[in-house]
Amino acid sequence: MSSTVNNGAASMQSTPDAANGFPQPSSSSGTWPRAEEELRAAEPGLVKRAHREILDHERKRRVELKCMELQEMMEEQGYSEEEIRQKVGTFRQMLMEKEGVLTREDRPGGHIVAETPRLTEGAEPGLEYAPFDDDDGPVDCDCPASCYRGHRGYRTKHWSSSSASPPPKKKKKKKGGHRRSRKKRRLESECSCGSSSPLRKKKKSVKKHRRDRSDSGSRRKRRHRSRSSKCKRKEKNKEKKRPHTESPGRRSHRHSSGSSHSPSLSSHYSDSRSPSRLSPKHRDEGRKTGSQRSSGSRSPSPSGGSGWGSPQRNGGSGQRSGAHGGRPGSAHSPPDKPSSPSPRVRDKAAAAAPTPPARGKESPSPRSAPSSQGRGGRAAGGAGRRRRRRRRRRRSRSSASAPRRRGRRRPRPAPPRGSSRSLSRARSSSDSGSGRGAPGPGPEPGSERGHGGHGKRAKERPPRARPASTSPSPGAHGRRGGPEGKSSSRSPGPHPRSWSSSRSPSKSRSRSAEKRPHSPSRSPSPKKPLSRDKDGEGRARHSEAEATRARRRSRSYSPIRKRRRDSPSFMEPRRITSAASVLFHTTGPAPLPPPAA
């Protein structure tokens, strides 16, 4: 066959138009038929040759397998190495003979082998190897030829028994292999399951996070998740709150998001607030969704109607007194701030009045401070306040109501409410003044306010808010906490951006923090109020620098967040309406551009 193939190839190559035995397209049409015919003639040889090589290889493999089985069997039976070698050699030779003729004829392709010049014992010169020489034994075999000669009779006699015994061994081996493979497969499947399950878990968690960011249901899931981890977090947070590192990890996560405080707070409060937990985008979304959820869940609650009341609860108790008292009272924020805060305070106060039950939950005294301020505002801007309340409620529902309500509750648990009022007022003033323009002095009052009024929040936030914006977050929380926060942030004009940004983070923080106050009240918030009030002031001072930095960060973050909140993609109706209402209430559309910017 090889000669025919070679001849065919040579003849093909000899044709001027063929290269490597294949006709070239450029060749003249006359040469094509010849080349094709030659190729066809050569094909069977090529195919047979390939088959032969493959079959030879398989034959060799089969023989070696059987020889190995025989060797193992003999070793098990206790034969000496020499005996084993001799028997294996003879067995191999016999197998080669059988493979060459007898076995091959019974198998597909055996006819090809029979057709080939190879004889039972002869090796075709063209093949890779000669199966064996009669006297020298198999060419590949290392055993001496005498081995094979002496044991040929033995081979033929014991062929059936030896061959029969090896196959069972094959079966055994196969079984063992199957068992092993099964075990391996199981292990691999388990490993893969384990790995896949982690992946799935990760994917699920990612999906859950996405859902949480977008769904209130997911928020609940977060809450549940965070609750389990909350216990740990609460303990950690209790310890960390005192060090002001409530949850550095959370901080890092939320801080990276820019609302690390709100995330930490939100994480403290619950993962539902963990919108803040979520990456900044997710936090914003989570805040938005959280606010929506909170608005959904909180707005259902009376404070939901006065979602702003709930924000006012947060801001109202600490931030309102701070934002309302601070803004209107401190007038640190531009007159717009006091005026807009006062309207907002009024709205919030009005909302607080409707939501005093909810606010009452939080801290009637801070409430009363913002309420008293807001009450005058209420009288002045009752209708406008109501409208704003509605808008704010929407907003608070969407973003602040849940945290704000919780925040209110937090002020409630926080005995530092009085201080939170003064602090929040100072914060609002300092936040509005320093948070926006005088972070240095402002942060202290703001941080104090946050620590005092938000004592819990501030304490929670200082660790969080400090990185993001502790005082601003308190102040921002106050501003955020109440629509005032937004209105203030918007009304302040230039500061509105920072405030709106810090507020939006603060809002998310205050929301999450305030929300957390509820859940933190579960563990951290009550402790936080005390530790925050105590540590809050120290932290407020300590975090004043941090808070100023965090405020700047949070402002930068919060503007982005606010944009996200305001972005029609997340909460178009509520955010836009709430943002528009806040803007219109506080400064009008003008402040919106700064937050958006």
Swiss-Prot record:
Signal peptide: none annotated. Pfam families: cwf21 (PF08312), SRRM_C (PF15230). Expressed in breast cancer cell lines. Residues 99-109, 530-549 have a biased composition (Basic and acidic residues). Residues 257-278, 291-313, 417-433, 466-476, 488-507 have a biased composition (Low complexity). This is Serine/arginine repetitive matrix protein 3. Residues 1-47, 99-597 are annotated as: Disordered. Residues 55-98 form the CWF21 domain. Gene3D superfamilies: 6.10.140.420. Belongs to the CWC21 family. GO terms for cellular component: nucleus. It comes from the Eukaryota. InterPro entries: mRNA_splic_Cwf21_dom, SRRM3_cwf21, SRRM_C, SRRM_Domain-Containing. Disulfide bonds: none annotated. It comes from Homo sapiens (Human). May play a role in regulating breast cancer cell invasiveness. May be involved in RYBP-mediated breast cancer progression. Residues 315-328, 374-383 have a biased composition (Gly residues). Residues 1-31 have a biased composition (Polar residues). GO terms for molecular function: mRNA binding. Residues 149-158, 168-186, 199-211, 219-243, 384-412, 550-565 have a biased composition (Basic residues).
